[in-house]
Amino acid sequence: MNPLIFTMILLTVMLGTAIVMTTSHWVMAWIGFEMNMLAVIPILMKKYNPRSMEASTKYFLTQATASMLLMLAIVINLVYSGQWSMTKPLTSTTSIIMTLALAMKLGLAPFHFWVPEVTQGVQLSSGLILLTWQKLAPMSILYQISPTINLDLLLLMSLLSILVGGWGGLNQTQLRKIMAYSSIAHMGWMTAIMVYNPTMALLNLVIYILLTTTTFMMLMMNSSTTTLSLSHMWNKTPLLTTAILTIMLSLGGLPPLSGFTPKWMIIQELTKNDNMIMPTIMAVMALLNLYFYMRLTYSTSLTMFPSTNNMKIKWQFSHKKPTANLSPLIILSTLILPLSPMLALLE
């Protein structure tokens, strides 16, 4: 793709998200979503092949359906309130339809089926944009409508997402699918706390984006897309492989790593609101996520796949890539937990 055209497309994606996050007019928010969706499709098809074509088509159909539901909710809200402003409280019907539309855009269960398929069909760089940047706009709208959102519906989808994210990641050998199911589970944690403490949901989003970005950047450096290629990284970049596995455990929520921080704070916040059953179920389901990450770490680090002798000296001939920006990302992705007492100020 021409670098100038690619830059313009990236700017359009950013502009669409910025419009959604800053506007207080429902039509402008819808336009922002459409700009973002149409601009991100060429990024998904950056490497043109049948798989990326199929992934882009699935993404377009899902997002177009979500946009249609969103516009339906906006029109119903206009009929009831007579205003386009996002500051006005939503009616119950509008709230349910809008929650479903945003759940479809975020990839919450039961609207999650497109996330693993699309992520698996695109390049690692496109998958990074899909699982990080594309979550910002829907989450900002959820944040704004959180006071009038349907609590029961959102909690049900949150529990389903955490369960699906845990079950789906089991027996996966493709790293992009593992990251996609991890994304579904993390979205479930964020939406579970959205009504009780929206600021904490945003904190969870920031930590999730940080962890996912670091993981994808390190996978891109070695073009690793399967557990087999990840295990061969020991011969090329042993320190980087150790960092990847540590951050994957952080994504699974293993204490004392950074990924444990939002889970701990969310469970604490839910129990403060006299909601005991929900955090108990969420904590048990989160063990599924941690299990497949620990199994991935075990199979990669403690068991060696068969390899030829010349693979064992591959690190001597590997091309050195710049890693200056990875150091702060790795530190933040593993060592945020000691800062969590300061995060209590969010409450």
UniProtKB/Swiss-Prot annotation:
Which compartment or compartments is the protein found in? Mitochondrion inner membrane
InterPro entries, alphabetized: Complex_I_Subunit_2 (IPR050175), NADH_DH_su2_C (IPR010933), NADH_UbQ_OxRdtase_chain2 (IPR003917), ND/Mrp_TM (IPR001750)
Q: Name one GO molecular function term.
A: NADH dehydrogenase (ubiquinone) activity
This protein's membrane topology, according to the annotation, is: Multi-pass membrane protein
The protein's UniProt keywords, in alphabetical order, are: Electron transport, Membrane, Mitochondrion, Mitochondrion inner membrane, NAD, Respiratory chain, Translocase, Transmembrane, Transmembrane helix, Transport, Ubiquinone
Name a Pfam family for this protein: NADH_dehy_S2_C
Which regions span the lipid bilayer?
3-23, 25-45, 59-79, 96-116, 122-142, 149-169, 178-198, 200-220, 240-260, 276-296, 326-346
The top EC class is translocase
One of the record's GO cellular component terms = mitochondrial inner membrane
Please give the catalytic activity noted in the UniProt record.
a ubiquinone + NADH + 5 H(+)(in) = a ubiquinol + NAD(+) + 4 H(+)(out)
Instruction: Give an example GO biological process.
Output: mitochondrial respiratory chain complex I assembly
The EC number(s) attached to this protein equal 7.1.1.2
The record's note on quaternary structure and interaction partners says: Core subunit of respiratory chain NADH dehydrogenase (Complex I) which is composed of 45 different subunits. Interacts with TMEM242.
Q: Which family does it belong to?
A: Belongs to the complex I subunit 2 family.
Physiological role: Core subunit of the mitochondrial membrane respiratory chain NADH dehydrogenase (Complex I) which catalyzes electron transfer from NADH through the respiratory chain, using ubiquinone as an electron acceptor. Essential for the catalytic activity and assembly of complex I.
Q: Which PANTHER family match?
A: NADH-UBIQUINONE OXIDOREDUCTASE CHAIN 2
Instruction: Indicate what this protein is called per its UniProt record.
Output: NADH-ubiquinone oxidoreductase chain 2
Q: Which organism is it from?
A: Nyctimene albiventer
